[in-house]
């Protein structure tokens, strides 16, 4: 049995879960998320908990078991608490500003870079070098944060770029002159 897959998911108060065959819908105070579970995996509600089971121990079913349980758990956490990723910008002249719901970056290019907020994602800017990406869908929040980070990846020589808060960059020593 999968250690991740066999653990039941507690349904907090204020969260409504509907399971219709392979389709799972989770409603909570922050919004609604839905997911289609892969075919051999079955989800059910028992005693205020969601349990995810697999029919047999085939290799594919074992891998889908833990995945499906984690995705459903991420939905429950998302509609109750939400997800936030904080980021920092390092570099002279590098800054970010909130323009309506979108982010405008000044990253040393000849033009400002604009990132539009997809549905369900909100941006917050603290000062002009710190920002946070928030939403209820863990995958969307992480994807947008990765797209923002990719705009100007950290330079190992100068330490300039966009990074996640608390991320340590391995610095390199430059060439030594003769």
Curated annotation (Swiss-Prot):
Show the SUPFAM superfamilies listed in the entry: Ribosomal protein L6
Q: What are the record keywords, sorted?
A: Ribonucleoprotein, Ribosomal protein, RNA-binding, rRNA-binding
> Which molecular-function annotation in GO is an example for this chain?
rRNA binding
InterPro entries, alphabetized: Ribosomal_uL6-like, Ribosomal_uL6-like_a/b-dom_sf, Ribosomal_uL6_a/b-dom, Ribosomal_uL6_bac-type
Q: Gene Ontology terms, cellular component aspect?
A: cytosolic large ribosomal subunit
**What are its GO biological-process terms?**
cytoplasmic translation
> PANTHER family annotated for this entry?
60S/50S RIBOSOMAL PROTEIN L6/L9, LARGE RIBOSOMAL SUBUNIT PROTEIN UL6M
Q: What does this protein do?
A: This protein binds to the 23S rRNA, and is important in its secondary structure. It is located near the subunit interface in the base of the L7/L12 stalk, and near the tRNA binding site of the peptidyltransferase center.
Instruction: Tell me its family.
Output: Belongs to the universal ribosomal protein uL6 family.
Protein name as it appears in the record: Large ribosomal subunit protein uL6
> What is the species listed in this Swiss-Prot or TrEMBL entry?
Corynebacterium diphtheriae (strain ATCC 700971 / NCTC 13129 / Biotype gravis)
Q: What is the lineage of its organism?
A: Bacteria, Bacillati, Actinomycetota, Actinomycetes, Mycobacteriales
């Amino acid at each position: 049995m999968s250690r991740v897959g066999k653990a039941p998911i507690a349904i907090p108060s204020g969260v409504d879960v509907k399971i219709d065959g392979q389709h799972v819908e989770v409603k909570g105070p922050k919004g609604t998320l839905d997911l289609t579970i892969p075919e051999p995996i079955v989800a059910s509600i028992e005693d205020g908990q969601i349990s995810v089971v697999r029919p047999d121990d085939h290799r594919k079913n074992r891998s889908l078991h833990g995945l499906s349980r984690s995705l459903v758990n991420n939905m429950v956490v998302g509609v109750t608490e939400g997800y936030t990723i904080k980021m920092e910008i390092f570099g002279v002249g590098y800054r970010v500003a909130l323009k309506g719901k979108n982010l405008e970056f000044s990253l040393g290019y000849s033009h400002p870079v604009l990132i539009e907020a997809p549905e369900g994602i909100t941006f917050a800017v603290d000062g002009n070098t710190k920002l946070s990406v928030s939403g209820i869908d863990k995958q969307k929040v992480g994807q947008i944060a990765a797209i923002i980070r990719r705009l100007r990846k950290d330079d190992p020589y100068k330490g300039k770029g966009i990074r996640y808060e608390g991320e340590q960059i391995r610095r390199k020593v430059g060439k030594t002159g003769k």
